[in-house]
Amino acid sequence: MAPVVTVPENASPELVEKAKNLASVWQLNFDGNVRHGLVLMQSEAHLALKQLDEPKVGEVLVDFASDALTFRRLHGGGKKEAVAKAVGLKGQSEWRVLDATAGLGRDAFVLASLGCRVDMIERSPVVAALLADGLERAHHSAELSAWLPQRMRLHHGIAVDLMANWCNEPANLAPDVVYLDPMFPHRKKSAAVKKEMRLFQQLLGPDEDADGLLAPALALAKKRVVVKRPAGAPFLAQQKPHIEMQGKANRFDVYLIN
């Protein structure tokens, strides 16, 4: 069951109306009086996923101007960063990348900051609403507004279907790279899972149909498909990649297109 959209206590009529419109756009329910459970909280500042029963967990939002992402953008290693190497950005600029499992959009943002034009697909209306809110606020950011709107686009829908439709478009519109980072079930011993992962798992659960993403991705991409997996996780669809890039916590499996 999807969380309801709500507002803080004593919200202005304008904010209530904004929240109701948001609920309508994403086909979610609005309840201005809810005080328990997992909600989408529309405040004056931003939209956030929040567990009202666990105030210590904090909230999850998309903030492309956050200190963490700003540091990563400015000092994260640029094209030497692992995701950039996996995508194959060395010597390339303005590659088209399709992030078919966008989530909170962090890897998409890093790739966009390096010059890629990134289309993001997100099937969850709740997560898509968070992404849309983050993109909207980025449009008004002095540091981001000059380039981010031209390089990041959001599509809400089922990735397998959208990729299949994309294959029917002219070849010049196909992405150079399809990037996949499906939700993977966390091991039980990982009690200190990051707050957003806890809330995301509560909201979405693991991508049980993730294996079905690989074939349409391989059919669509012009250069390569990159799959981000936890270290030690099986290959997607049990298909061995051409390149494995091992990290401490994650692994990038790279499938080259001949």
Curated annotation (Swiss-Prot):
Catalytic function, reaction form: guanosine(1516) in 16S rRNA + S-adenosyl-L-methionine = N(2)-methylguanosine(1516) in 16S rRNA + S-adenosyl-L-homocysteine + H(+)
Entry GO CC: cytoplasm
Signal sequence interval, chain numbering: none
One Pfam short name: SAM_MT
GO terms for MF: rRNA (guanine-N2-)-methyltransferase activity
InterPro entries: 16SrRNA_methylTrfase_J, SAM-dependent_MTases_sf
Predominant localisation class: cytoplasm
Membrane-traversing stretches: none
The entry's keywords: Cytoplasm, Methyltransferase, rRNA processing, S-adenosyl-L-methionine, Transferase
Binding site for S-adenosyl-L-methionine: R106, D107, E122, R123, D181
Lineage: superkingdom: Bacteria
Entry EC number(s): 2.1.1.242
Protein localization: Cytoplasm
Physiological role: Specifically methylates the guanosine in position 1516 of 16S rRNA.
PANTHER family: RIBOSOMAL RNA SMALL SUBUNIT METHYLTRANSFERASE J
Family membership noted in the UniProt record: Belongs to the methyltransferase superfamily. RsmJ family.
Protein name: Ribosomal RNA small subunit methyltransferase J
